[in-house]
C-alpha cells in the first residue's frame, strides 16, 4: 500500500464521523502533495474542502466552487466530457450505497477549461484525476479527488483491476464497467519508457541503452501502437496511471512522504 492509500485508510478506520476532522486530515494531505485536491460529500453533493490551487479551480473563486457544489463541474469540465463525469459519479454513488466494502483505485482523464483574464478563446487543459472513495461506518461517504496536469488524451473513467494484466473502463452508455487487457510490453520497451522524457530525446535514449537511433525509433513506434497513444510523453503518463511503471514524479513524491506515513493529529 503506498503512502496515499495508507493515509486515506487512516481516515476510513479512524472512527471519526465529524466532517471537520476529515477535512483536517485532507488539509494535511494537500500540504504533502503538489497536486490540486478536493473533498466531495457525495450524499449532500457539495464540497467539504478544496485546496486553494488554480489547476482545479480554473480561474474561478473558492467561494463560487463551494456554493455551486456538484454544479461547479459544469463550469470547469469540457462539455463533451461532462456527461461521462456525471454518469460516473452517479454510478459510484449507487455502488457505494449497495456495497459498504467497495474500494477501488479509480482515476479519470478529462479536459478542463481554465479561465484566463483578457483571453476570450476557450482553452483546454488535459488533467488526471485520482479518485478515492471514503466510506464511514455511519454510511456517509466522500470522494477525494487529486488533480494534476496530464499529457494523456485518453478521455475516460477507469479503475485498476485486481490483476496487473487488466484494467476496467467505464461505459457511460451502458452505465457499467468493461474489462480491458493491458498490452504486453517487452523488457526493452519498458526500459525505454523508464527513461523517456519526450520524442526529442530519442538520441539520448539510444546512447543510454547503447542501441542505434533507428532501433529505438522502432521500439517507440511499437509502444505507441500497443498503447494507442500519440507520443512518448502520453505513453509514460498512461502506464504510470495503470501502475505498469511509476513515473519519476510519483517515485519522488512517495520517497519524500515516506517519513509521514505514521502521521496522526490531535482530535481534540
Which residues does each predicted region cover?
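Short loop/turn elements at sensory-signaling interfaces that couple input to output
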Residues: 129-143, 150-157
Amino acid at each position: 500500500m503506498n503512502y496515499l492509500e495508507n493515509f486515506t485508510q487512516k481516515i476510513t478506520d479512524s472512527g471519526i464521523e465529524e466532517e471537520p476532522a476529515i477535512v483536517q486530515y485532507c488539509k494535511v494531505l494537500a500540504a504533502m502533495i503538489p497536486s490540486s485536491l478536493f473533498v466531495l460529500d457525495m450524499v449532500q453533493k457539495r464540497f467539504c474542502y478544496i485546496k486553494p490551487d488554480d489547476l482545479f479551480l480554473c480561474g474561478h473563486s473558492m467561494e463560487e466552487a463551494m456554493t455551486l457544489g456538484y454544479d461547479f463541474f459544469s463550469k470547469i469540465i469540457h462539455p463533451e466530457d461532462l456527461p461521462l463525469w456525471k454518469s460516473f459519479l452517479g454510478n459510484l454513488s449507487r455502488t457505494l450505497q449497495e456495497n459498504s466494502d467497495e474500494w477501488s483505485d479509480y482515476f479519470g482523464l478529462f479536459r478542463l477549461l481554465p479561465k484566463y483574464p483578457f483571453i476570450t478563446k476557450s482553452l483546454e487543459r488535459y488533467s488526471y484525476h485520482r479518485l478515492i472513495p471514503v466510506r464511514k461506518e455511519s454510511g456517509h461517504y466522500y470522494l477525494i479527488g487529486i488533480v494534476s496536469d496530464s499529457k494523456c488524451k485518453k478521455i475516460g473513467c477507469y479503475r485498476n483491476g485486481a490483476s496487473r494484466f487488466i484494467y476496467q473502463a467505464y461505459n457511460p452508455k451502458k452505465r457499467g464497467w468493461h474489462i480491458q487487457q493491458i498490452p504486453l510490453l517487452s523488457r526493452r520497451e519498458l526500459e525505454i519508457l523508464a527513461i523517456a522524457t519526450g520524442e526529442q530525446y530519442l538520441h539520448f535514449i539510444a546512447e543510454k541503452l547503447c542501441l542505434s537511433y533507428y532501433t529505438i525509433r522502432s521500439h517507440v513506434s511499437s509502444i505507441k501502437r500497443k498503447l494507442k497513444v500519440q507520443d512518448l510523453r502520453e505513453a509514460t503518463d498512461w502506464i504510470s496511471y495503470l501502475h505498469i511503471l511509476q513515473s519519476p514524479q510519483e517515485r519522488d513524491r512517495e520517497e519524500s512522504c515516506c517519513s509521514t506515513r505514521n502521521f496522526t493529529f490531535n482530535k481534540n
